[in-house]
């Protein structure tokens, strides 16, 4: 199976993302599957960012620790990624004499790592020395004088060089595409569909062609016919699509990385054709509100839910912290609201543009007091879509806050897959116990056998909501007997959910072996790809991915894990929080750990290396460091 890893890097604000999307689009048009990931600093312009794209004729689920083709147009990209580069480097010859110390945007720690790698080879600290380092390892270097080529393009179209400056990206993209050996027409089409200005299309196409014609066809990739409609989508977008398919009618948010793009997409696509009762088709839409802060965002979402619309908000760590009191209020008042929690590097501001899984226990215990919080976590883009619908259904059925965890890795990564994976079954909407009032007064918190009360909406009858303890009507009371009754009623809903939601729906099990890879969230893809490689070496493994953490599938987990010789927790945090929850709920402990908390994704190769260290050296805890 083909697996080619391509990377492009450069200063933020200079078109790295656009270049990567054009390249990926062109490769996908030739019938290939992709998995791409964007890494960037918490800086608007100037700092180093890069985009990695993995290419294969079969579906791809993970990133790699190496790069086959590194496309660069600045010095920092070469310095940051030369040790990962295995086959080809495309670089700017004008920077050959640039030293590490002259790259002022590079962090001192990274500069020291570069010097250490070059010093081991008794080399200096210039780009020219990096080229020698790569040549010693069989990497071929392809240099371009970008200024000369940009001048040629500017002269051709009789425009100033400043107008076509960013077209140098397309020179690197064109050269990369040429190495693959795919038809230039696909790249030309991708450029045309990206830019609207005719002049921009022309000079970017010329730049790409200059690069394309300057390199040999090395990989000789063949074109594949696309049999079924495919979709190329990132995590923010697929979550928004799932919410729209699930009947979302109100979304509030305050801008925060990496959550904001979801709300922006919903707002851009808020006018919808809706099928309502009786199969009647009518125009409708979603109200999207950018609030003044996260406190307002959660309170707006709660208020909208009380009026009877499907309501959600989206945020990340610091914003989720601010929402804590509002979530507790929603728990007390049994409000069906969804909080999409985009997890990033923490604590505090932490790593605002990097990933992490350190907030699982926070999500499980957010808000003061004991009340039901349903918590689910998605492992890939298809799961995100269906889980977004599921979250809305769970919130209304059990009348409680639902927290849907998506990590930054999945939010900013994109994948290519068959569209039928998100259209192959009906979008079922379950609204729970909604009734029409029969009088002016309604006991909103009526005690029932399953803990779930009939629900009407604001304006349909006299209903009372308060943050204080209350009786069935909603009136404030501190009576001890009532307190016991209402407290049990609220918490009984989680017991009901535990009985009604099949445990098989809460856990994803792949394979059957004595070695278990226990995980949740984004490591899923790296694990599945690693399992395929490990099986070639005769190492049989199985994956157990927890999708719902509350209510926890304790009975099924006990059944699956009982008697296994190795339970290896693979997570993006320090404490293996998913494994800690397993121990808390079942008394079963992980035997080994593969952990990473650098803010970068776990790769396929890191999982393979970690498992081999555990099996061959009996290492208890393998810590991963990869990623620039």
Curated annotation (Swiss-Prot):
The organism's superkingdom is given as Archaea
Where is the motif (YPITP motif)? 254-258
Q: Which residues bind substrate?
A: 257, 344
For this UniProt record, give its keywords in alphabetical order, as a comma-separated list: Oxidoreductase, Pyruvate
**GO biological process terms on file:** response to oxidative stress
Describe the reaction catalysed, as an equation: a 2-oxocarboxylate + 2 oxidized [2Fe-2S]-[ferredoxin] + CoA = an acyl-CoA + 2 reduced [2Fe-2S]-[ferredoxin] + CO2 + H(+)
Note the coiled coil stretches, chain numbering: none
Disulfide bond entries: none
Keyword flag Oxidoreductase: yes
A GO molecular function annotation here is: 2-oxobutyrate synthase activity
Can the keyword Oxidoreductase be found in this entry's annotation?
yes
Q: What is its EC number?
A: 1.2.7.11
Q: What is known of its domains?
A: The Tyr-Pro-Ile-Thr-Pro (YPITP) motif is important for the turnover of the reaction, presumably through its flexibility and mobility.
Q: What does this protein do?
A: Catalyzes the coenzyme A-dependent oxidative decarboxylation of different 2-oxoacids such as 2-oxoglutarate, pyruvate and 2-oxobutyrate to form their CoA derivatives.
Q: Oligomeric state and partners? A: Heterodimer composed of an alpha and a beta subunit.
Matching entries from NCBIfam families are given as:
OAFO_sf (TIGR03710), Oxoac_fdxalpha_Archa (NF041170)
Q: What is this protein called?
A: 2-oxoacid:ferredoxin oxidoreductase 2, subunit alpha
Q: Write down the species.
A: Sulfurisphaera tokodaii (strain DSM 16993 / JCM 10545 / NBRC 100140 / 7)
Q: Which gene encodes it?
A: ST2435
């Amino acid at each position: 199976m083909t697996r080619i890893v391509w990377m492009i890097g450069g200063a933020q604000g200079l078109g790295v993302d656009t270049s990567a999307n054009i390249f990926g689009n062109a490769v996908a048009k030739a019938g290939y599957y992709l998995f791409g990931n964007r890494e960037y600093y918490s800086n608007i312009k100037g700092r180093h960012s890069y985009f990695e794209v993995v290419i294969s004729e079969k579906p791809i689920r993970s990133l790699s620790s190496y790069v086959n083709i590194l496309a660069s147009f600045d010095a920092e990209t070469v310095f940051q990624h030369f040790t990962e580069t295995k086959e080809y480097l495309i670089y700017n010859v004008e920077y050959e004499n640039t030293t590490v110390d002259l790259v002022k945007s590079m962090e001192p720690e990274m500069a020291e790592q570069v010097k250490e790698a070059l010093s081991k080879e008794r080399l200096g600290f210039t780009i020219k020395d990096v080229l020698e380092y790569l040549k010693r390892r069989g990497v071929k270097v392809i240099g371009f004088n970008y200024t000369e080529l940009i001048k040629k393009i500017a002269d051709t179209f009789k425009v100033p060089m400043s107008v076509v400056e960013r077209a140098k990206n397309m020179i690197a993209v064109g050269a990369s595409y040429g190495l693959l050996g795919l038809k230039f027409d696909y790249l030309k089409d991708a450029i045309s569909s990206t830019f609207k200005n005719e002049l921009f299309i022309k000079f970017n196409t010329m730049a790409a062609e200059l690069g394309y014609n300057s390199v040999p066809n090395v990989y000789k990739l063949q074109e594949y016919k696309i049999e079924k409609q495919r979709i190329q989508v990132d995590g923010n977008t697929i979550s928004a699509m799932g919410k729209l398919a699930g009947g979302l009618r109100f979304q509030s948010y305050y801008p925060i990385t990496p959550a904001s793009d979801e709300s922006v997409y919903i707002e851009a696509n808020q006018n919808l054709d809706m099928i309502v009762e009786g199969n009647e088709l009518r125009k409708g839409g979603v109200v999207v509100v950018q609030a003044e802060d996260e406190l307002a965002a959660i309170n707006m979402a709660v208020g909208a839910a009380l009026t009877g619309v499907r309501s959600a908000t989206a945020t990340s760590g610091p914003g989720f912290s601010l929402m804590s009191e509002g979530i507790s209020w929603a728990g007390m008042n049994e409000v069906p609201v969804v909080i999409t929690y985009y997890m990033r590097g923490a604590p505090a501001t932490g790593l605002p543009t990097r990933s992490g899984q350190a907030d699982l226990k926070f999500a499980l215990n957010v808000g003061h007091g004991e009340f039901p919080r349903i918590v689910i976590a998605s492992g890939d883009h298809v799961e995100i879509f269906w889980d977004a619908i599921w979250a809305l259904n769970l919130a209304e059925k059990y009348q409680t806050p639902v927290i849907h965890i998506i990590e930054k890795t999945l939010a900013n990564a994109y994948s290519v897959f068959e569209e039928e994976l998100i259209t192959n079954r009906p979008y079922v909407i379950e609204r729970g116990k909604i009734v029409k009032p029969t009088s002016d007064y309604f006991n909103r918190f009526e005690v029932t056998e399953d803990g779930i009360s009939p629900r009407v909406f604001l304006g349909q009858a006299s209903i009372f909501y308060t943050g204080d303890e209350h009786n069935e009507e909603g009136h404030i009371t501190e009576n001890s007997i009532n307190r016991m009754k209402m407290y049990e009623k609220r918490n009984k809903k989680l017991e009901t959910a535990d009985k009604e939601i099949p445990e098989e729906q809460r856990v994803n099990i792949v394979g059957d072996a004595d070695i278990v890879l226990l995980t949740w969230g984004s490591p899923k893809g790296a694990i599945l790809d690693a399992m395929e490689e490990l099986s070639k070496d005769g190492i049989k493994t199985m994956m157990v991915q927890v999708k719902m953490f509350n209510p926890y599938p304790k009975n099924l987990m006990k059944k699956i894990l009982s008697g296994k010789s190795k339970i290896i927790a693979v997570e993006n945090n320090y404490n293996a929080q998913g494994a800690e929850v397993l121990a808390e709920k079942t008394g079963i402990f992980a035997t080994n750990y593969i952990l990473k908390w650098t803010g970068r994704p776990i790769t396929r190769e890191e999982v393979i290396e970690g498992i081999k260290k555990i099996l061959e050296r009996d290492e208890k805890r393998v810590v991963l460091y990869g990623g620039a």
